[in-house]
Amino acid sequence: MKFLHNQYTITMLILFFALTMLAVERVHAKEQKTSAIPVFNIFELGVQAGKAAAYDTVGENNITRSITNEPGTLSMVSVKDKENPNLAYMIEIYADDAAYRTHLASPQYKAFTEQAPSILTDHKLRLSLTAQYLGDKGSPIKQNGEMITNMVRINVLPGEEAAFKAAVMPEMVQSLAVEDGVLAIYAGTLVGAPNTWLFFEIYASESAYQAHRQTPHFQKYLSQTQQMLGEKTFYNLRPALLKNKGGLHFNSME
């Protein structure tokens, strides 16, 4: 009986150890999933005169195939300057560095880079951003002619960084959660210049955007931050191609 008791004790200890290790592995896996920092880039590109259609074609191929075939490519958006159709912007979000490297090695990206010299001018500006808040609705965007895109660049005054972040982050979270017309909000700070924020937003319509501006949470944000801000730059953009996976949620404060 003593032998059986000892054997039972050993078996229970082994089982306890196995369950403990499994729990640790699950926690570790969860931490790996939530701790990954997305790659967030905005590109400003000059398009040669008469090459707008060629740019749209190669860009559509790159965007569509990447969103469809690459699990880590979360959002790719092409927009144009309303007043200068030869000035284009690409907004790209990847799950992590590995996902971005996968995209750079893809055939559709290589096709884009091979055709770029005959389509683009020498004006190529990459804005590398530290993701602060990245969110979109649970389903992929189904683009239509009513949708609008906004991009704003804001310089936060020195010493106001923490207060500004504390004000703007909950406003973005609430906007996406409670407003049907807010389809995506992507916000980040410029790498090397953390006082510079860029916001890219997609709305279901102009009326949805105007309704957003009247919400209590947006008005609260305006009143809280009006003394914190320096220069603001508003980009006058129109959507060209909007593609995303849907269900993106990254909050640097969580």
PLM features: residue spans?
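Glycine-rich beta-strand-turn "strand-cap" elements at beta-sheet edges
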Residues: A29-I37, V77-N86, A111-T149, L157, ...
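Structural beta->alpha junctions
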Residues: G46-G50, Y94-A95, I154-G159, Y203-A204
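Solvent-exposed, non-transmembrane alpha-helical starts
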Residues: A52-D56, R101-L104, E161-A167, H212
